[in-house]
Amino acid sequence: VYKRQRMPGKNVVILGSGDIGLIMARRMVLEGAKVQCVAELRPQSGGLKRNIVQCLDDFNIPLYLNTTVAQIHGRDRVEGVTLTKVDDNGKPIPGSEWEVPCDTLLLSCGLIPENELTRGLGADMDGKTGGPIVGENLECSIPGVFACGNVLHRP
């Protein structure tokens, strides 16, 4: 959105209230979108309190806790989503669904690294971080295979 100066849509629902989701809510508003809401599966936001205030409260964006996306509507593009409340186990609560019109669903849920490929290749893995062991140049124990980003650590 920022670099390419191109908006994916004008009416946004965000799933995930960690700091990245909160900051994206603010960025989308500043770029001219209407953020309908932020939905969070857990009973509390994963973001910093100041980000909740500066990114949601300051822009009157509702935060729905214990809530997830049950359905995405639309054929060629998103036309809306069905949100639903969830119980303590993260399971949808029947009868708690409601529809939110939107043309964009921004997913900001979990930065858990995907290490299946490096593990499957037989790379040496770090028991503490869950990611591959790398050298100074970020090369794994397999020559020519490099790692970066979230695979190097886990939240």
Per-region residue spans from a language model:
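Residues forming the flavin
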Residues: K3-P155
